[in-house]
Amino acid sequence: MRDSNHADKTWPLTWSAAVLLLGAGAAQALSLAWPFDGDWSGATQGWLQCLSMIVLAGILDRSQSRQQAFFSGWIFSSAWLVGSTWWLFISMNKYGGLPAPMAALAVGLLASGLALFYGAACAVFYAVCKTGVSILLRASAFAAVWVLAEIVRGTVFTGFPWGAVGYAHLDSVLQHWAPWVGVYGLCALSAFIAMAIGAEKRERKSISGVGKVGLVFLVAALAYTWATSPSRADNDEHRSKHPLRVTLLQGNIPQDLKFGEGVNRALRDYSEALLSSTSDFIVTPETAIPLIQQQMPDRYWQPLEAHFSKGSQAAMIGLPLAMRSEQGQLKYSNSVIGLMPQTNPAASANYQYDKHHLVPFGEFVPPLFQWFVRMMNIPLGEFTPGSVAQPSLMFKGERIAPNICYEDLFGEELARSFADPNKAPTLMVNLSNIAWFGNTVAIDQHLNISRMRALELGRPMLRATNTGATAIINARGEVTHRLPSAVQGALTAEVYGIHGSITPYAQWVSRFGLWPLVGFALLILLLASATAYASRHGQRRFGP
């Protein structure tokens, strides 16, 4: 369908459609965590995400060429991803010293580059479904290409799946499918709904008999999984018999002082808090102690070790570590040290977790990007990654699994620890410092990411952060306790670990990763392609 204001044939979309897509993409970014003050502040808005994607689906469905389809997806996704990650500008400009125009350009290039995946997905959708495909199969194909684009964005070049559309449904009716299919499955469901509603109701192939049977099974499966979702079940029978009293520390050390003038303050404040707390389990933020042990003042670390080894408490402390390789070279890691009672007085080894999923430009420099790093004044290091699914800390009957910073963005990696139900974590802990991004919506977005992991995996998540959001999340993904952001404080509460019960998502992802989703999406695209081909060539249609 052409518009009268399509004056330039070299431009694949009307200006009105482009503006509408930009607005819809921006609205989708808002749906992930409402950035404005008020009752909705920080909350997800699933309804807004659905409306935004319906706009994309409607325009995409009316595309006249693959070029139009590509640019529809690319423009929408560029606006959405800029709106989701604009706060990267703060780290590059304020803390990295990159001039404002260059920092803004870098954010725009990142977002528009990642949006290429979605543009390509929309072009594939057009090629497969331009004719001879029913609404049901059309919506299924759109869900398939969208989830494939989300997975590709979340895995290639180390992956950056921040802002995936599924996060907008933490508080919508779709949340109950998260323990079955995870955030990527919610992405597919939201895309399916959007195309089913937004597709132009012009002449389409009616749903075949096979398709009607398939639709009945689909509705039945969705109803069953929704009704039996672990998120709707009572976890009392699986929770620990006795609560664990925890204290989560929030230092609120300004990022521009953290590795300079703020070092002495951090050493003093965290040492005092760790030694004075009466809780069973105390957690500091990521790199709360911003020095490797060899750089610490004399008699700083030893009193901490002695305090926890002789008492009945445990602590997780975030700090960088330096170890010498067999070749004598120093290797650095972003780590967590666990201090706890030592049953064997001769034992001196502490629990250690090394961050596995490192941040590009923060903890390692990607190939060919040294020139970009040299333009910024950020203390970067080449860190060594730890392994996936490292052992949990064992304390008072709980298996406590830490993750650092944006590692909780990769649910498929956290799920690897659930492969053996007898060794699966009963509690998860996230240690973060996102002060790099200021007191912005990034704090609420990251909190919602942790909420999704708790919901997917059916385990409480404890969050200890430098500036926020320090919080306790139950196994249903609900925030039960939270400190205000950008203040110094300690959050103390009682939590119960969850034992035995493993969510369906944790079961299949821990064994097969995301491949079942990829395979199912490709199967749908194959079916849609075969159906469209048969319809165009006058053959009997065998798809739905």
What is each of the regions a protein language model found here?
Residues 2-231, 431, 439-440, 480, ...:
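Membrane-embedded alpha-helical bundles of multi-pass enzymes
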